[in-house]
Amino acid sequence: MQRMIEISSPFFLNPDELSTPADWAAVFGNANPLALEIGCGIGDFIARTAADNPGTNYIAIDFYNKGCDKTCRRLERLAIPNVRVVRDEARKFIVERIPKGSLCAVHINCPDPWPKMRHRKRRLVNREFAAFIREYLAPGGDFYFATDFDDYGIDVAEFMPGVEGYANMLAPDRYRHELEGYHLSKYMMKFMAEGKRIYFVHYRKTAEGAA
């Protein structure tokens, strides 16, 4: 069981104190486009990405309290104003707090690959999840997935063309091992230093996929 750390940071949100769905313009104090990172880790990816895109508001969600705390500390240290951090289970949070058709981007970087065959049904990103998250993307919204696990990367790259309402932004490739302009997290760089390859998948919601 994870040790719960009390997080007292202006960047940290208690999901139970948000409306259903949340009024994100009120939370951020502006109506800028809204993006979501699922699994923020220690916050290095979201900090760099948000700093590069000050006109976008970012929600960084993680189930682990320690990661949320480290992310908040990083944001405070770097004074990055356009991120809010939430500790919650991803799908539950999305259903309860994110308005459908509101996200300009979703980032999922190196989620648990559940490598054992009998556990793979526990993977976050599968065909059903891709269809689910599409409902929360705005038309033209981007879906980014990255993993260091070969089987996971190939699996996502293989099923995504069959999910309706998306366009492959890497076509004719189904995945790439480099994605220009996409920040690498500490974990990605660690995996690459070990000789592993990162699989990047990038799709965009089409107008036909509008909710």
Curated annotation (Swiss-Prot):
Methyltransferase among keywords: yes
Chain residues that bind S-adenosyl-L-methionine: 37, 62, 89, 112
Keywords carried by this UniProt record: Methyltransferase, S-adenosyl-L-methionine, Transferase, tRNA processing
CDD domains recorded: AdoMet_MTases
One of the record's GO molecular function terms: tRNA (guanine(46)-N7)-methyltransferase activity
EC number(s) given by UniProt: 2.1.1.33
One Gene Ontology CC term in the entry: tRNA methyltransferase complex
Source species, domain of life: Bacteria
Protein residues bound to substrate: 116, 148
Catalytic activity entry: guanosine(46) in tRNA + S-adenosyl-L-methionine = N(7)-methylguanosine(46) in tRNA + S-adenosyl-L-homocysteine
Catalytic residue list: 112
Entry keyword 4Fe-4S: no
Annotated pathway: tRNA modification; N(7)-methylguanine-tRNA biosynthesis
Gene3D superfamilies named among the record's database cross-references: Vaccinia Virus protein VP39 (3.40.50.150)
InterPro entries the UniProt entry points to: SAM-dependent_MTases_sf, tRNA_(Gua-N-7)_MeTrfase_Trmb, tRNA_methyltr_TrmB_bact
Physiological role: Catalyzes the formation of N(7)-methylguanine at position 46 (m7G46) in tRNA.
Family of this protein: Belongs to the class I-like SAM-binding methyltransferase superfamily. TrmB family.
Protein name per Swiss-Prot or TrEMBL: tRNA (guanine-N(7)-)-methyltransferase
The organism of origin for this protein: Geobacter metallireducens (strain ATCC 53774 / DSM 7210 / GS-15)
Underlying gene: trmB
